[in-house]
Amino acid sequence: MQQTKTKKKFFYGWVIVFCCTLLVAAGTGIFVNCLGIFVKPVCEELGFDRGPFTLYSTIGGFVGMFAMLAYGELYRRYPQHIRKFIALGTVVCCGAFYGYSLSTKLWHFYALAAFYGTGSMTLAGISITTLINNWFVEKRGLATGLAFAGSGVSAAVMTPVLTTIVADFGWRMGYRTMSLVSLCLLVPAVLLIRVSPAEKGLLPYGVKPGEGAGENTPHIPVLQQTGITRRQAVKTPAFYLQILGMLCLGTAGMGMSGHVIAYLTDIGYSELTASTAMSLVMTVMIFAKILLGAVFDKIGPVPSAVLTGICMLASVVALRFAGVGSFMPYVFSLCFGFGYSTLTVPYSYLIGQNFGTREFAAIYSLASMISSLGNSYAPSLSGTLYDFFGSYVNVWNIYIVVSVAATVSLTAAAKISRQKGYGRY
């Protein structure tokens, strides 16, 4: 009877999932996914070219890439202070975006972006995966999918809201709105987060008393780990193919994301249509992330790698031909809802399947840091290519090739890993 009652108790880990959803909603959904709204209005008012202006997002991503390694080490050494690091990141990121609203020179945006990068990783995957891995053994995939779906919810809501605010009150008010709304999302998350179940006198979801968790480390279940070490992984071709695939995927995905609204308005669509299309992308993402995770569990790593690449390829092709008919922006929205989701959900799944869980965190952090280059330079690359070609058409042609390369690389990595059995060592 007591066991039955215990099972029916609400598990605080789902509060942690909700908190992670809020972190992703602000850190990715607002701070990253809504940046494209500001490209045209800022450049037109301040006289910037699009390439140099969008470099500020590259700077923020580049600084964040190295900050991720630092936070990874800090989280390892001082796990009890993770919530404090997230609180610090909240202040830094919200402050930086408010600072954008006061900027008048390019270097203002660059300096604030570098400042933003020092805190942005606390609101990203490293915090999310650490918290969820601490709290869940079973249903970890579901918890992860739900958490990352937060970016789609917030972006779907905030894209049309910010577009309207920028049109009616100017881009400066738009940046201020981003800062204040994000602060309202992040403060409750910081207050509710608990780093481990031990802080609430609990065990991870799926671990029963006496199973897995030792007396001295109640928050860390002792599970049998399989796979290869990071030292072994970096000596395999599969590891570098995995990174190349992730790098290409990030280049195409982030290269499109920040320029969709600008491109659609350039080819004759209204700002309302463009923002609605981007908002629909974020809406589709809410369901796509959860659906992709469930499908991956069913079909295995090699088909999952193929599906991942196809989602991105279909997105670029749909955007390339967005001018064919008035329905095409919405076809793109459907495709990119899945394509954009491949920048989060497949990474941890494929790395875990290809290389195992023995040193998953070490392999994942290294691969993510390197592949983050694609996320950081892609918006600026698209802007620079636009300035060079005079339109986005050839930019999308290039990204079609990049998406094919991503598909081939990820599939090859999964096949090699399966043949060699890296994940089963």
Residue ranges and their predicted role:
Residues 25, 96, 107-123, 247, ...:
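Hydrophobic core of transmembrane alpha-helices in multi-pass small-molecule transporters
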Residues 67-80, 289-300, 386-387:
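Helix-to-loop junctions at the C-terminal end of transmembrane segments
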Residues 42, 122-136, 342-355:
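Intracellular juxtamembrane helix-capping segments at the cytosolic ends
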Residues 279-285, 289-291, 296-350:
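C-terminal transmembrane helical hairpin of 12-TM major facilitator-type secondary transporters
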Residues 151-200:
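Helix-loop-helix hairpin linking two adjacent transmembrane segments in secondary transporters
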Residues 114-149:
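Cytoplasmic helix-loop-helix junction between adjacent transmembrane helices
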Residues 31-42, 231-292, 378:
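Extracytoplasmic gate region of multi-pass secondary transporters
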Residues 15-41, 46-50, 67-71, 159, ...:
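Extracytoplasmic
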